[in-house]
Each structure stands twice: as C-alpha cells, then as structure tokens.
Curated annotation (Swiss-Prot):
HAMAP family on file: SlyX
Pfam families: SlyX
Source species: Oleidesulfovibrio alaskensis (strain ATCC BAA-1058 / DSM 17464 / G20) (Desulfovibrio alaskensis)
Name of the protein in question: Protein SlyX homolog
Disulfide-linked positions: none
Gene that specifies this protein: slyX
Upper lineage: Bacteria, Pseudomonadati, Thermodesulfobacteriota, Desulfovibrionia, Desulfovibrionales
Annotated family: Belongs to the SlyX family.
Length: 73
C-alpha cells in the first residue's frame, strides 16, 4: 500500500469514528429530550384535569356576584 492511500484510509477511519461518536451523542440528547417531553405531557394532563375540576367552582363563584360593585353603592 502506498503512503497516500494509507493516509486516506486513516483519514476515512477517523471521519467514521467521529461521525459515529456524534450520532451516539445526538441519540443520547434525543432520548433525554423525549423523556422530558413525556414528563411535560404528564404534567399538562394533570393541569387539565385540575382545571376541569375547578371550572364548576369558578362558575358557581361568579354566579353570586350579580349586584353592583361596592364602589357604586
């Protein structure tokens, strides 16, 4: 094998190594983001449930305020 061919092969091997390393790091980051997204989705669902539970209470509280505000009296 000639020196230039050997150098080219070494360069290609280095490139493949760094690409594989980058792909692995990106995969780790994507996995972490998906876990965070799943957690945020669970929290959003919990907030929606709480809001649905509170909606009747808020409507009932608003129903009693039919009179004029105190500063109009």
């Amino acid at each position: 094998m000639t020196k230039t061919l050997e150098d080219r092969i070494i360069k290609l091997e280095e490139t493949v190594y760094f690409q594989e390393k980058t792909i692995s790091e990106l995969n780790d980051a994507l996995t972490q983001q998906q876990l965070q997204l799943d957690e945020m989705h669970k929290l959003q669902q919990a907030v929606e449930i709480k809001l649905r539970q509170m909606a009747p209470l808020l409507r009932d509280a608003d129903a009693g305020d039919d009179g004029p505000p105190p500063h109009y009296l």
